[in-house]
Amino acid sequence: MQRHESGNTESNVVHPAELIVYSLLSNDLDGIYQSINDLRESQALLILMLRKIKNSLKEETQLLYDKSNWKDDNERLDSLRKRVDSLKSRFQSLKLRSDKLEQRE
């Protein structure tokens, strides 16, 4: 409680210095709370973005290293290799025949 010049006690009177200190502190605290809230929001957004990137990389890795997707392609490639080898051997045999025929003439 504070006494006024008249000597009356009033419990509702607040000293101006107290008001100034309270005002300064509350403004600073409001600013700090706002900054903390802004940081939390940006942190939440960053976490969401990182999760999206992580999931995207995970899917890409699965596609790159999943050998079951390559199975059909590998089988087709093996089949084509066999055909090419067969054609090469046929070509060699035809070339030998052609060379023999040329030598006879």
Curated annotation (Swiss-Prot):
Give the UniProt keywords, A-Z.
Coiled coil, Endosome, Transport
State whether keyword Membrane applies: no
State the superkingdom.
Eukaryota
Alphabetical list of InterPro entries matching this protein: Snapin/Pallidin/Snn1
Principal place of residence: other
- Does the keyword section mention Transport? yes
Subcellular compartments: Endosome
Q: Name one GO cellular component term.
A: endosome
Write out the coiled-coil annotation as residue ranges: 70-105
Family note: Belongs to the SNAPIN family.
Q: Relate the assembly described in the record.
A: Component of the biogenesis of lysosome-related organelles complex-1 (BLOC-1).
Q: What does this protein do?
A: Component of the biogenesis of lysosome-related organelles complex-1 (BLOC-1), a complex involved in endosomal cargo sorting.
What name appears for this protein in its UniProt entry?
Answer: Biogenesis of lysosome-related organelles complex 1 subunit SNN1
Q: What is the scientific name of the source organism?
A: Zygosaccharomyces rouxii (strain ATCC 2623 / CBS 732 / NBRC 1130 / NCYC 568 / NRRL Y-229)
Tell me the name of the encoding gene.
SNN1
